[in-house]
UniProtKB/Swiss-Prot annotation:
GO terms under biological process: isopentenyl diphosphate biosynthetic process, methylerythritol 4-phosphate pathway; terpenoid biosynthetic process
The keyword Iron is annotated on this UniProt entry: no
Binding site for ATP: 111-121
GO MF annotation list: 4-(cytidine 5'-diphospho)-2-C-methyl-D-erythritol kinase activity; ATP binding
EC number in record: 2.7.1.148
Pfam families for this protein: GHMP_kinases_C (PF08544), GHMP_kinases_N (PF00288)
Protein name in UniProt: 4-diphosphocytidyl-2-C-methyl-D-erythritol kinase
Keywords recorded for this protein, A-Z: ATP-binding, Isoprene biosynthesis, Kinase, Nucleotide-binding, Transferase
Catalytic activity reported: 4-CDP-2-C-methyl-D-erythritol + ATP = 4-CDP-2-C-methyl-D-erythritol 2-phosphate + ADP + H(+)
Length: 297
């Protein structure tokens, strides 16, 4: 790793930093590497459903986090090791050599176990914001390496735009997409991503697609290209995914699952009212973003 650049004086705080969700317009599994990682092709699309992060400088070098949605929001102890925002902060702290720390406050709006990349987006926004807060800047290739070490989806959220994604998620090509609106439905139940990828009946040999083939849909149903190879397995593991897709069909909408679920989505073309979502399921109308809110950071 190359030497980090001290770019400016540290800031006292940064507030209202967005971390947008993504939808996978399609997700094809094209193979599997000898180390077990799956090879994929997908288009990742940014949407205006965001978590919000706040950062306050700590001069004692400690990294702490609280969830503003939690009843125990004043308890800064027992930070979960799997928390991606904390892991991102610690990784950047180690890579940059800064003696500074941070307290992170998170307003969690993107549902977990949804396939919308909420935790990965939090981590990416954390990396970008903390470079400013701490007054350091890593070379872009080093920042991307940290992002990939945190999770396959994190590098996408550093890229700044919608993207054609290949490999294990590290091969990212920016693309443009037409402005559009979507309805996203998240059922109460989640699904385990490892369980999906370990399923013996997961299709792992979808024919490789091309960006040219995807672009050919530009004047047609671009958001209907391809399919999600994870969806049939996820539907078996989580029946509420099938129920969610049935609900979309009842609204005359053609839906599919995003990522490894359990959220599903469909393009909408007007502001017509939709029926209430079943039970305590989350339903939200969204627009796609043309660029990431932190694209110039």
């Amino acid at each position: 790793m190359t030497r980090p650049i001290v770019s400016s004086r540290p800031l006292k705080a940064l507030y209202d930093i967005p971390a947008p969700a993504k939808l996978n317009l399609f997700l094809h599994i094209t193979g599997r590497r000898p180390d077990g990682y799956h090879l994929l092709q997908s288009v990742f699309m940014l949407i205006d459903w965001c978590d919000t992060l706040h950062f306050e400088l700590r001069t004692d070098g400690q990294i702490s986090r609280t969830d503003l949605n939690s009843p125990a929001q004043n308890n800064f102890e027992a930070l979960p090791a799997e928390d991606l925002a904390v892991r991102a902060a610690r990784a950047l702290q180690a890579a940059s050599g800064t003696p500074l720390g941070v307290h992170i406050s998170l307003e969690k709006n993107i549902p977990s176990q949804a396939g919308m990349g909420g935790g990965s987006s939090d981590a990416a926004s954390c990396l970008l914001a903390l470079q400013r807060l701490w007054g350091v800047r890593l070379p872009s290739q080093d920042l991307r390496a940290i992002a990939l070490s945190l999770g396959a989806d994190v590098p996408f959220f550093l890229s700044g735009s919608h993207a054609w994604v290949e490999g294990i998620g590290e091969q990212i090509t920016p693309i443009t997409l037409p402005a559009a609106r979507f309805v996203v439905l998240k059922p109460a139940a989640g699904v385990s991503t490892p369980d999906i990828f370990n399923a013996p009946d997961l299709k792992r040999d979808t024919k490789t697609a091309t960006m040219l083939g995807f672009a050919a849909y530009a004047d047609g149903p671009v958001f209907g290209f391809g399919h999600n190879d994870l969806q049939p397995v996820a539907q078996k593991l989580c029946p509420q995914i099938s129920q969610s897709l049935d609900w979309l069909e009842s609204q005359q909408l053609q839906g599919r699952m995003t990522g490894s679920g359990s959220a599903v989505f469909a393009q909408i073309f007007d502001d017509a009212d939709l029926a209430a979502a079943p039970g305590n399921w989350i339903i939200r109308k969204c627009k796609n973003l043309q660029t990431h809110p932190l694209a110039c950071w």
